[in-house]
Amino acid sequence: MINAVIAIELEAYLEHDGQIEVVHDQGLPVDGYTLYLRYENERGDALAQWLCDHPDHSWLTQFGILLATSYHIPLHDYTPHTLAA
């Protein structure tokens, strides 16, 4: 039997010289956020992934700022494959 979970992943990003980079370190500037819904097995392997996109990105940026500041979310990768390392 495969145990599966639905994960919600919020990534902060920075635009630099026309390139988009994911922000992993606290204290770096952030230009916006992306929100992913991911269907994973128990090992953390993505079985399916959806990027939540909307023409008006301001709501997602405001949501990301709200989560990051309200819950003091550190900008680190806590996915199962990095926790095992």
Per-region residue spans from a language model:
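Generic structural marker for isolated residues within well-ordered, non-membrane alpha-helices
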Residues: 64
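Short N-terminal "domain-start" leader segments
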Residues: 1-43, 70, 76-81
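A short, exposed loop/beta-hairpin motif centered on an aromatic-Gly-Thr core
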Residues: 42-61
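Intrinsically disordered, low-complexity segments enriched in small/polar and acidic residues
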Residues: 84-85
